[in-house]
Amino acid sequence: MAGNSIGKLFRVTTFGESHGPKLGCIIDGTPPGLEISENDFQKELDRRRPGTSKYTTQRRELDKITILSGIFQGKTTGTSIGLTVKNTDQRSQDYNNIQKLFRPGHADFTYYKKYGIRDPRGGGRSSARETVMRVAAGAIAKKYLYTKYGILIRGYLKQIGNITCKLKSWNEVEKNPFFCPDVKQINNLNLLIKKLKKEGDSIGAKIKIIAEKVPIGLGEPVFDRLDADLAHSLMSINAVKGVEIGDGFAVVNQKGSEHRDEMNKHGFTNNHAGGILGGISNGENIIATIALKPTSSIKKIGKTIDLHGREQKISILGRHDPCVGLRAVPIAEAMMSITIMDHILRHRGQCSKTY
């Protein structure tokens, strides 16, 4: 299976399955001398860790990071960084009833048709459990970008179902299990998730990610545009079905006189472009929004087929998130951090810019 790596100069390769003994990653390209500790990794991993909230999956994992290589006496050495996390709370028996069934809306069918074999336990490699190592790698990128360049990357829940959350306070985002910046919507989100769990159903979500203080010049035309690489990295997250940069699909209803980001001696007067022009960062905040589908792992009985093509009924009994968007914020932050980190190293190499 190819496609397990992302990045050119800052390159991340992940491995492992949902119910395997461990997950891991190799990170190449980290500059030497960056101060980083287990706490830096753990802080990010705990933000996406399952079992920490009654609103998400009740699979309880410690997600304790183990550093194998590339870090000595609290600093990166410039060599490959190896990281692993143990799986400790698998319940593979929950999937006994669907070993020969394809879960509708999941990768079961396509994996089996492509490879002729699949791991039915929690989705195997296609499980969102894989993203724990993206967050671990993202912790390195996030710290490097902030320490060296003052770049701050953070996200929040923008929408679940028909409930919209406005960015009223970044402080509120980390105070609730929804990553919601609007305290007035917390109770509505609470009621919605409780209702979905009772019904055995799920719902989709939107997440917005913002990178502040990104320097001008990141991105390479034509095929290595910064926005194209961001779309690639964000779209690679499980359940993501859409990516918007800046105003995204709203530009369809805009006129050129409205959408263009006019300039004066102080800079841009708007940021409809989301901080990227011609595939290159323009110094404004980089803004991206992702749409995540409702998980198909639900208790509601549905229709499917088995390995022999016979029609069957299916109900998923495993522990699952009623809304995968509730734990997607740190994952999206990590992927944006990894992509910007890669591009800042590429820009430094090509243009000798260190800012």
Swiss-Prot record:
Pathway: Metabolic intermediate biosynthesis; chorismate biosynthesis; chorismate from D-erythrose 4-phosphate and phosphoenolpyruvate: step 7/7. Reduced FMN (FMNH(2)). FMN binds at residues 125-127, 238-239, 278, 293-297, 319. Coiled coil: none annotated. PROSITE patterns: CHORISMATE_SYNTHASE_1 (PS00787), CHORISMATE_SYNTHASE_2 (PS00788), CHORISMATE_SYNTHASE_3 (PS00789). The keyword Transit peptide does not apply. SUPFAM superfamilies: Chorismate synthase, AroC. GO terms for biological process: amino acid biosynthetic process; aromatic amino acid family biosynthetic process; chorismate biosynthetic process. It catalyses: 5-O-(1-carboxyvinyl)-3-phosphoshikimate = chorismate + phosphate. One of its GO terms (molecular function) is FMN binding. InterPro entries: Chorismate_synth, Chorismate_synth_AroC_sf, Chorismate_synthase_CS. The keyword Lyase applies. Its cofactor is FMNH2. Pfam families: Chorismate_synt (PF01264). Its EC number is 4.2.3.5. CDD domains: Chorismate_synthase (cd07304). NADP(+) binds at residue 48. PANTHER family: CHORISMATE SYNTHASE. This reaction introduces a second double bond into the aromatic ring system. Belongs to the chorismate synthase family. Homotetramer. This is Chorismate synthase. It comes from Buchnera aphidicola subsp. Baizongia pistaciae (strain Bp). The lineage of its organism: Bacteria, Pseudomonadati, Pseudomonadota, Gammaproteobacteria, Enterobacterales.
